[in-house]
Amino acid sequence: MKIQVETVSPVERKVTIEVDPDRVAKELDRAYASLSRRVKLRGFRPGKAPRKVLERQFKAEVEGEVAERIVTETFTEAVRVESLPVVAPPSVSITDGVAEGKPMRYSARVEVKPKLEPKDYKGLEVTRKPPEVTDESVSAELTKIQDSMAQLVAVEGRFEAQEGDWAVIDHEGTIDGKPFDGSTAEGVTVKVAPGPITEGNVEALKGKKIGDTVELDEPFPADHRDEALRGKTAHMKVTLKALKVRQAPALDDALAKELGIEGVETLDALRTRIRSDLEKREKRRAESELKDALVKAALAKNEFEVPPALVERAIDTMIEGAAERFARQGIDLRQLQLDVSRMRADLREQALLQVRGALLLEAIADAEKVEVTEEDLEAEAARIADELGMPLAKVQQQTRGKDAREALKNRIREEKALSLLSSAATIQQ
């Protein structure tokens, strides 16, 4: 097999391969032998049909399958022999196809990681906002918890709706004089506030009394989930049936105990737990921002091309992550009818930065001969278990496979490279 590699760009190679006639012949022999055992031809027992007969009926199909197999096998061999850091499947163009007694020739264009020689990554100057937890931030978290436990209770001694109230309503609606799906309902709770009724707001109830009916025209947005309602305007009749307000529980030991947090029985204990959690969060925030600043500073001194396939893959991962987060909230991302092209365009800059950073850190780790030991892997597994609150044995099991283990090693190498940048940098607080 003859292999020729041309550099198209820093992130693309053209690989031209010529396959020996003998190898082509052997692959054809194997393909026809397999076909003979599988195919049923009139007048011949399985495995006994002459090759000439098979060629008359199946030549194009067999040669296509053989060409595909030869390309797959020989390209993989070429990548190994030439040590090509391939990042995506090749685009193949066959020059001379499969033919008895002749070599097969094809070319493959493929994206590769750029060869980097990182420079000026020591002595970076960055600014770091130190982690800080104040009494005010602890109180703000307590208020969030208090608000999350608020309940709607009936308004007493008042019958007129005020902005911010929650109203129990009956409603009926029409479009062009005809009812539509979901136009009639009873006992619906909405907020007396600005905004569309489709989002649970009816500002027109402000100043109305229980038993009053208001009429309003409600336009549906052009991207409404119900295609039949998009861009239409509904005439709605809304009757106020009852008024409620959100009532938050008192900030006391009873609230702390109701949360059911292990070891938290009093308000003081809850404050202590909140402060501890905020300190951990702030530490992670400060570390993350420092890492981002170090990577951006290093990238500013190292310009290089990035394989488009890696950027697209990073965008795919981001969208998959968003879908998983929505799914945990019971929302199917597909049902939101989002503009995927717009979403991908919005994520492209972030993905490009992520890929460039990862490639540069990998190159720095190579330049500094960073190694990952078994002790490093064990320590990282323990850290993950502690952070996620999972048993160590479960984390070890999940990271035992070849791919998972390799991903873990790459993450540790990246962290070690970042530590090198940090230790050699000038960091201003």
Swiss-Prot record:
GO terms for cellular component: cytoplasm. It holds the Pfam family FKBP_C. Gene3D superfamilies: 3.10.50.40, Trigger factor ribosome-binding domain, Trigger factor, C-terminal domain. It is found in: Cytoplasm. It comes from the Bacteria. It catalyses: [protein]-peptidylproline (omega=180) = [protein]-peptidylproline (omega=0). GO terms for molecular function: peptidyl-prolyl cis-trans isomerase activity; protein folding chaperone; ribosome binding. Its EC number is 5.2.1.8. Residues 164-249 form the PPIase FKBP-type domain. InterPro entries: PPIase_dom_sf (IPR046357), PPIase_FKBP_dom (IPR001179), Trig_fac (IPR005215), Trigger_fac_C (IPR008880), Trigger_fac_C_sf (IPR037041), Trigger_fac_ribosome-bd_bac (IPR008881), Trigger_fac_ribosome-bd_sf (IPR036611), Trigger_fact/SurA_dom_sf (IPR027304). The keyword Cytoplasm applies. Its main location: cytoplasm. GO terms for biological process: 'de novo' cotranslational protein folding; cell division; chaperone-mediated protein folding; protein transport; protein unfolding. Keywords: Cell cycle, Cell division, Chaperone, Cytoplasm, Isomerase, Rotamase. Belongs to the FKBP-type PPIase family. Tig subfamily. Consists of 3 domains; the N-terminus binds the ribosome, the middle domain has PPIase activity, while the C-terminus has intrinsic chaperone activity on its own. Involved in protein export. Acts as a chaperone by maintaining the newly synthesized protein in an open conformation. Functions as a peptidyl-prolyl cis-trans isomerase. This is Trigger factor.
